[in-house]
Amino acid sequence: MLEPWHASVRKRQRQAPKFWWFDPGVARALAGTLTVDIVPRSTGFGRAFEHFVILEIVRAADYARSDFRFSYLRTKDDAEIDLIVERPGRPPVLVEIKSTERVEPRHVRDLERFLPDFPGALPLCLSRDPLRRRIGDVLALPWQEGLAEMGL
């Protein structure tokens, strides 16, 4: 479960959490979509990839026995940060997850929009793109390398 992020605990409690199953296959089974192929570049593939990456980050943090807190942020106009990783004594990590094989500036616009609200935060775009590069203030890199950037 990912709690919604807000600086105010009271406002955080009024927003709905996101639920993630321990295995993306369980979610597909419950949705009755196990026999439906997940095709790259589809909405279903993007959702499954985001689910998978979030689970890998949470599992790595659990394995490392870190005290990281995980949340997400969605505004009333549906701008979203897929994952906010709060690390004790260190700046937070703002994570955008994209299933694309080529990250483009349009993929990180929402993330860049939130940066003034999180001074000092580490903005990452994790994807299937094999190249590591900067896009504006955002570090775009393969999802596996993102775990190391977070300290996992």
PLM feature spans:
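Short, surface-exposed loop/helix-turn segments at secondary-structure junctions
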Residues: V36-R41, I97, H107-L111
